[in-house]
Structures are given as C-alpha cells and as structure tokens.
C-alpha cells in the first residue's frame, strides 16, 4: 500500500469539501466530542466529497461509525487502540493507521499489524499539549528501519517548507493540520503543499 506524500488532517466536512477539490488525495477527518448524529453527517459529507475527487478518506477514532458508514480506513491513537475491537475492524475490511510517539508505542502498534504507523511530534506543535518531546528527523530514519516496508507518516509541526525534509529522511507521507487550517489563505497553502510534495508523488 502507498500513501500520498501529502496527508491533510481536518476537523470538519466543511474543510474536506473546501480543500479536497484542489487535488488533495489523502485526508483524515478528526472530529472530537460531537454528538453521534453530527458525526454521522460529517462522515457522510466527507465521504461523498472524497469519492468525487478520488481522495482517500481516513476516519479518526470512530471505528464503529466508520464501519456503519461504509468507510474503508481508520486511524487510532494508542488509547483508542486499547479500547478498539481490532477483529471487528479487520472483519469489516478497514485499513488501520496508528499513532506512535516512542519505541514502546511502536512495539504496541506493530503488534496490531497496522497498514501504516505515524510518528510525532517531529517538531513542536501548537495543535495540542504533548507529553512527548519533539522527535526530530533523526528519529524518522530510525523508525524507517524499524517498520521496514510499512508506510510511515510524519506528523507534528510540519510546514510546506519542512515537508521535503521528512520525506527525504524516511517518511512516506507528511501530515499537516495547522499549517493549512490556520493559514490566512488555506487554499493557497494547500497548493504550496501539493507542489512541495509533488516529487514524491511521482516516484514509483
């Protein structure tokens, strides 16, 4: 399995509908603390927008809803992984991505046989408080050796200018949140990301 080198993460279907038509091919819908009917509607809208643009949609956390709504890819954090029914996820045919922040979490993730692992934060991030220190690009090279051919996602503090650095140091995909969603011109920044990651999109 290959991931697009530009991995957009957003918190609403509005963002999906706004940015995916620009050429985004990999997007995660990460919504927190909303009622189930709202979540279902957000997933349905995001799924429709992604289907229209041939974009891979990944649902964060809500694996039961992802199964119910016919999605095919989910992402779980370490705490969510402990509570999830991996057998049910696999029976439903969903692909699985997992977050990791240290070697112990990587071992836990690899034991679950995911379809990709994410390492972060590579650089300091303003998105949320993190108990882990920034990993740096050096850790990416180490993770690359540990995971073998499995796709590796870098996340945390990545900008369009930094994306080539993580892709050159072992990551298959660079994940971004605030560099786009908090930019004064998210559409222009998305196009900059598409351009910055283009050399890796055409490889292979």
From Swiss-Prot:
Q: Hey, which pathway is this one from?
A: Cofactor biosynthesis; thiamine diphosphate biosynthesis; thiamine phosphate from 4-amino-2-methyl-5-diphosphomethylpyrimidine and 4-methyl-5-(2-phosphoethyl)-thiazole: step 1/1
What residues bind 2-[(2R,5Z)-2-carboxy-4-methylthiazol-5(2H)-ylidene]ethyl phosphate, as annotated?
A: 157, 177-178
List of residues binding Mg(2+) = 61, 80
Single biological process term from Gene Ontology: thiamine diphosphate biosynthetic process
Question: Which UniProt keywords are listed?
Answer: Magnesium, Metal-binding, Plasmid, Thiamine biosynthesis, Transferase
Enzyme Commission code(s) on record: 2.5.1.3
Q: Which cofactor does it need?
A: Mg(2+)
Report the enzyme's class at the first EC level: transferase
Reactions this protein catalyses: 2-[(2R,5Z)-2-carboxy-4-methylthiazol-5(2H)-ylidene]ethyl phosphate + 4-amino-2-methyl-5-(diphosphooxymethyl)pyrimidine + 2 H(+) = thiamine phosphate + CO2 + diphosphate; 2-(2-carboxy-4-methylthiazol-5-yl)ethyl phosphate + 4-amino-2-methyl-5-(diphosphooxymethyl)pyrimidine + 2 H(+) = thiamine phosphate + CO2 + diphosphate; 4-methyl-5-(2-phosphooxyethyl)-thiazole + 4-amino-2-methyl-5-(diphosphooxymethyl)pyrimidine + H(+) = thiamine phosphate + diphosphate
Gene Ontology MF, one: thiamine-phosphate diphosphorylase activity
**Cofactor binding, per record:** Binds 1 Mg(2+) ion per subunit.
The record's listing under Pfam families reads: TMP-TENI
Entry keyword Protein biosynthesis: no
Give me the disulphide-bonded residues. none
Q: Which CDD domains match?
A: TMP_TenI (cd00564)
Cellular component terms per the entry's GO annotation: cytoplasm
Cite the binding residues for 4-amino-2-methyl-5-(diphosphooxymethyl)pyrimidine: 28-32, 60, 99, 128
What the entry lists under Gene3D superfamilies is as follows: Aldolase class I (3.20.20.70)
> According to its UniProt entry, what is the function of this protein?
Condenses 4-methyl-5-(beta-hydroxyethyl)thiazole monophosphate (THZ-P) and 2-methyl-4-amino-5-hydroxymethyl pyrimidine pyrophosphate (HMP-PP) to form thiamine monophosphate (TMP).
The UniProt entry's sequence similarity note says: Belongs to the thiamine-phosphate synthase family.
Q: Entry's PANTHER family?
A: THIAMINE-PHOSPHATE PYROPHOSPHORYLASE, THIAMINE-PHOSPHATE SYNTHASE
> HAMAP family per the record?
TMP_synthase
Q: What is this protein called?
A: Thiamine-phosphate synthase
Q: What is the protein's species of origin?
A: Rhizobium etli (strain ATCC 51251 / DSM 11541 / JCM 21823 / NBRC 15573 / CFN 42)
Q: Which gene encodes it?
A: thiE
């Amino acid at each position: 399995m290959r991931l697009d080198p530009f991995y957009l993460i957003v918190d609403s279907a509005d963002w999906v509908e706004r940015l995916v038509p620009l050429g985004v091919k990999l997007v995660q819908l990460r919504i927190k603390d909303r009622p189930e009917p709202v979540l279902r509607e957000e997933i349905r809208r995001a799924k429709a927008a992604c289907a229209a643009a041939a974009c891979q949609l990944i649902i964060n956390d809500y694996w039961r809803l992802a199964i119910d709504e016919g999605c095919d890819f989910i992402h779980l954090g370490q705490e969510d992984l402990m509570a999830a029914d991996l057998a049910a996820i696999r029976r439903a045919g969903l692909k699985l991505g997992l977050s990791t922040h240290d070697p112990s979490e990587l071992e836990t993730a690899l034991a679950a046989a995911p379809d990709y692992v994410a390492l972060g934060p590579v650089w300091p991030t303003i998105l949320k408080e993190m108990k882990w220190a920034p990993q740096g690009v050096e850790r990416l090279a180490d993770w690359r050796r540990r995971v073998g051919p499995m796709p590796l996602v870098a996340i945390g503090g990545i900008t369009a200018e930094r994306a080539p650095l993580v892709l050159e140091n072992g990551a298959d995909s660079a994940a971004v949140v605030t560099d786009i969603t908090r930019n004064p011109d998210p559409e222009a920044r998305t196009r900059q990301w598409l351009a910055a990651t283009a050399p890796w999109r055409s490889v292979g």
